[in-house]
Amino acid sequence: MQQLEFYHIAFLILAVILEIIANILLKMSDGFRRVWLGILSLLSVLGAFSALAQAVKGIELSVAYALWGGFGIAATVAAGWILFNQRLNYKGWIGLILLLAGMVMIKLS
């Protein structure tokens, strides 16, 4: 594995952003009834995995995947709240807190 450099982190950030975009587009596609939004969602997922593949060249897979998934979920929750007026119940908030705590623990290990 190469040494961690800025561009590995940049690819990880890009992967998170593309995952969030994919999730938003998927919601907006209304179950692929709006085909072009569904196709854009799939292309965003492809881009996210491509960026993640570049990120893991310098970041351990377990760390990169945990950060990608965790930040993606947290940001998707925020986007759902802002764009679609979706709210978490208390169990959802507990799950999100546990997820974020788990990301911190993986990063510190």
From Swiss-Prot:
InterPro entries: Small_drug/metabolite_transptr, Small_multidrug_res, Spermidine_export_MdtI. The keyword Translocase does not apply. It is found in: Cell inner membrane. This is Spermidine export protein MdtI. It is a multi-pass membrane protein. Gene3D superfamilies: 1.10.3730.20. Its main location: membrane. The chain crosses the membrane at residues 6-26, 35-55, 64-84, 88-108. GO terms for cellular component: plasma membrane. GO terms for molecular function: amino-acid betaine transmembrane transporter activity; antiporter activity; choline transmembrane transporter activity; spermidine transmembrane transporter activity. Pfam families: Multi_Drug_Res. Keywords: Cell inner membrane, Cell membrane, Membrane, Transmembrane, Transmembrane helix, Transport. Catalyzes the excretion of spermidine. It comes from Yersinia enterocolitica serotype O:8 / biotype 1B (strain NCTC 13174 / 8081). Belongs to the drug/metabolite transporter (DMT) superfamily. Small multidrug resistance (SMR) (TC 2.A.7.1) family. MdtI subfamily. NCBIfam families: PRK10650.1 (NF007934). One of its GO terms (biological process) is glycine betaine transport. Forms a complex with MdtJ. The keyword Amino-acid biosynthesis does not apply.
